[in-house]
A protein has these predicted regions:
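Class I SAM-dependent methyltransferase Rossmann-like catalytic core
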Residues: 22-34
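Conserved alpha-helix/loop element of class I SAM-dependent methyltransferases that forms part
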Residues: 34-52
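Class I SAM-dependent methyltransferase SAM/SAH-binding core
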Residues: 55, 61-103
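A short acidic, Gly/Pro-enriched loop at the edge of an enzyme's catalytic core
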Residues: 102-113
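A short SAM/SAH-binding and catalytic strip from SAM-dependent methyltransferases
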Residues: 112-126
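A short, conserved alpha-helix within the catalytic core of class I
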Residues: 123-135
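Conserved catalytic/acceptor-binding region of the Class I
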Residues: 133, 137-213
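Conserved Class I S-adenosyl-L-methionine
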Residues: 190-273
């Protein structure tokens, strides 16, 4: 076990085996991935009776952890990739660690809120749920009003801009990149429906990500897709070049500066221990 202390980031390096599809583009991932709406976190925080400890599992670049740090005394932000953790933003009350979702060093019944953003479909669900039940705070008849800890998982689907641009996006996503998507991507495409979730279900309002982006910002995001990187590795060519001219024409004049509203639907599962 190696502990690396740097810029207030506590990185616990452990030998782990997992599908690492994003570490090679960790810096791009950190800068180009869409930001989740603050209203989503406000909703989740309103569900927990205590705000002592949150665990952001598979934190990636730490985006969700940063939001949680505004509400909780302490946040544990973990990921199986030390490259992702190395690009996370430090915060005084965030402790970044490297360990798999299914095997943690967290204490029993210690976590008030577990969040899993854009990652649950990668986990060994049986092992992860067992670990989540172990670390989630158990309900009691005291200060928590009989309510236990909360677990929330969400993913966002394919973005939408306009009918014309969306047609080009689907050409890239399905026809060009279709064979290069991992099998787990289908779980997101199915909106997490049918995925086991052995917790007391909590109904959630609808959330979506809305950002005003230039074409270059959107292209930067698309380059973080694992399927794009797999296509490049296998074919030694850039799949985005196949659709770029059509996409630029559909975007309109001054593609660098002109902003368009980009929307991603969010699919959520929220429950209580």
């Amino acid at each position: 076990l190696i502990i690396v202390l740097c810029n207030k980031i506590n990185v616990t390096l452990k030998p782990v085996q997992f599908k690492d599809l994003f570490s090679s583009k960790s810096k791009e991932y950190a800068s180009s991935r869409p930001k989740y709406p603050k209203s989503l976190f406000e909703f989740l925080v309103g569900l927990v009776p205590r705000r002592n400890l949150a665990w952001d599992c598979a934190t990636g670049n730490g985006q969700a952890a940063l939001f949680l740090s505004e509400y909780f005394e302490q946040v544990i932000a973990s990921d199986a990739s030390h490259e992702q953790i190395a690009n996370a933003q430090p915060r005084n009350n965030i402790r970044y660690e490297v360990f798999p979702a299914e095997r943690t060093n967290l204490a029993d019944s210690s976590v008030d809120l577990i969040t899993i953003a854009q990652a649950l479909h990668w986990f060994n669900l049986d092992d992860f749920y067992k670990e989540a039940r172990r670390v989630l705070r158990k309900h009691d008849n005291g200060g928590d009003g009989g309510r236990g800890g909360v677990i929330a998982a969400w993913a966002y689907g394919l973005h939408s801009v306009s009918a014309q641009i969306d047609t080009i996006t689907h050409l890239l996503y399905e026809d060009i990149l279709g064979p290069y998507w991992p099998e787990e991507r289908k779980i997101v495409e199915n909106r997490y429906e049918g995925m086991p979730f052995p917790f007391h279900k909590i109904e959630t309002p609808g959330f979506q990500i809305e950002l005003d982006w230039s074409l270059s910002e959107l292209i930067g995001y698309v380059y973080t897709w694992s399927s794009v990187q797999k296509f490049i590795e296998k074919n030694n060519s850039d799949p985005i070049k196949q659709i770029y001219n059509d996409l630029a024409a559909a975007w309109g004049e001054n593609q660098i500066r002109h902003k368009r509203r980009v929307v991603w639907p969010i699919y959520m599962k929220v429950g209580r221990s």
